[in-house]
């Protein structure tokens, strides 16, 4: 077994969603049905139990109410490829995952961003589900915007195209953020395994 010492080796991108499929999701989540369900993204502060934005009014909006069996299956298949194929040689000491969260939709309008953070997600665990986030799964639904670059490790711009799903460990060693959108609207989703 060969260990991978460059953290970038743990970041994998898969082109798994067709442009038409991505467009169909954007059409659904942009419909009047979901308009009231979008809310400002916040970060949980474990020290005092509060939720707050780190970018003030420039924080993105999120939609948790969207559910799609087809998208769940795409996410599941991509996690499987990452964990059981691309990192199959780690199976002897890494037991994979116990489940994954339903994808949460992200919408970045002009000027909106996501502050630098790592994915220590506390809200996933309500007493029934137990564990820690192990993998972060990001999907990009469009690319007809400017700005909105996905950055890892403080300053590394990750190539990310419409229809791509990117997976990386949900660890403090993988800080990431999205730069402010300059034109258009950026649509993506995120899920986590535990």
Name what the model sees in each region.
Residues 1-165, 173-194:
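Fe(II)/2-oxoglutarate oxygenase catalytic core
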């Amino acid at each position: 077994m060969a260990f991978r010492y460059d953290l970038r080796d743990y970041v994998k991108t898969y082109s798994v969603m067709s442009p038409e499929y991505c467009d169909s999701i954007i059409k659904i989540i942009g419909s009047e049905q979901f308009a009231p369900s979008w809310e400002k993204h916040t970060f949980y502060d474990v020290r005092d139990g509060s939720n707050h934005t780190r970018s003030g009014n420039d924080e993105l909006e999120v939609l948790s109410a969207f559910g799609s069996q087809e998208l769940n299956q795409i996410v599941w298949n991509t996690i499987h490829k990452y964990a059981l194929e691309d990192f199959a040689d780690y199976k002897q000491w890494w037991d994979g995952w116990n489940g994954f969260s339903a994808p949460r939709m992200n919408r970045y309008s002009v000027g909106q961003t996501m502050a630098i953070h790592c994915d220590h997600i506390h809200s996933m665990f309500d007493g029934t589900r137990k564990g820690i986030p192990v993998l972060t799964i990001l999907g990009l639904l469009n690319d007809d915007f400017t700005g909105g670059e996905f950055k890892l490790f403080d300053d590394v711009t990750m190539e990310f195209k419409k229809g791509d799903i990117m997976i990386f460990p949900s660890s403090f060693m993988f800080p990431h953020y999205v730069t402010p959108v300059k034109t258009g609207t950026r649509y993506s989703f995120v899920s986590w395994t535990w």
